[in-house]
Amino acid sequence: MKRILVGLGTSGHAESVVSHAIEIAQTQGAELLGVAVVDPSRLEWTGPRPIGVGVETLTAELRQDRMTKVAAEIEKANKLFAEKCLAANVPHQTCERTGDPFEIVADLVRYQDLCVFGLHGLFEHDVVPEPTDSLERLVAAGVRPM
């Protein structure tokens, strides 16, 4: 095993995911690829809205707030990943992608031997609810082994 894909979701959950991936990488002599994915279509969807003056402004502010929070979460998770990998002397790279998370991970996994993801906060960075079928969708897309 030489390459491990690590899902960097919410920074709060990233610590255990990164620690687990580092343990595996150390025993196998593997390189880690930390990936953070932003899905703008999910972050921009605000659901049904009332009609009225100022609704568009509030919606735009909500969208901007979500994007700002996601950027901060990704920065924290990437920093944590890099610091822990450096401290453990594990070779690593980071990757940030924008688009459908399931398509992106399915594409990246072709070049990896193992995937390590957390149970929570995989792609939505605690800003919008995580799809309840995330694991099923990853497996259906051919993301293995996890």
Model-based region annotation:
Residues 18-20, 102-146:
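Gly/Ser-rich helix-loop-strand patches that form or flank binding pockets
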Residues 32, 92-94, 146:
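Generic structural signal for residues in well-ordered beta-strands
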Residues 39-41, 68, 72-115:
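Structural beta-alpha unit
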Residues 8-12, 72, 96, 125-126:
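Residue-level marker of alpha-helix boundaries and capping positions
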Residues 29, 89-91, 143:
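A generic structural signal for alpha->beta connector loops
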Residues 56-73:
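A short acidic, glycine-rich active-site loop
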Residues 1-61, 141:
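Small/aliphatic-rich secondary-structure junction motif
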Residues 6, 62-66, 97:
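Short amphipathic alpha-helical segments at helix-loop
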